[in-house]
Amino acid sequence: MNKIRKGDEVIVLTGRDKGKRGTVSLRKDDSHLVIEGINLVKKHVKPNPMKGTTGGIVEKAMPIHQSNVAIFNAATGKADRVGIKVQADGTRVRVFKSSGAEIKAA
């Protein structure tokens, strides 16, 4: 079970975007996330008339490792760690480590 999922609001812990918040838009693999508005780089794109794309400089969000982000707890207004709790019926749910409150699915 992934502790950080698509649609979760996260806060960046390290790097040039430290302290910024954003929403996870894509999981590249088990360890990398693409977050809206975070880790933006400028890519130089060649024009391709076959695909109908124009050339130029495009800003693009690049993947960031999940160890460099933490889930944002709206109740406390701070970053928090995620734990897994097994309920009585055997289902597993994500909870905030600080409060034990269940994380709502996005």
Curated annotation (Swiss-Prot):
GO terms for molecular function: rRNA binding; structural constituent of ribosome. Signal peptide: none annotated. SUPFAM superfamilies: Translation proteins SH3-like domain. InterPro entries: KOW, Rib_uL2_dom2, Ribosomal_uL24, Ribosomal_uL24_CS, Ribosomal_uL24_KOW, Translation_prot_SH3-like_sf. GO terms for cellular component: ribonucleoprotein complex; ribosome. CDD domains: KOW_RPL26. It comes from the Bacteria. GO terms for biological process: translation. Pfam families: KOW, ribosomal_L24. Disulfide bonds: none annotated. Keywords: Ribonucleoprotein, Ribosomal protein, RNA-binding, rRNA-binding. Belongs to the universal ribosomal protein uL24 family. Part of the 50S ribosomal subunit. One of two assembly initiator proteins, it binds directly to the 5'-end of the 23S rRNA, where it nucleates assembly of the 50S subunit. This is Large ribosomal subunit protein uL24. It comes from Acidovorax ebreus (strain TPSY).
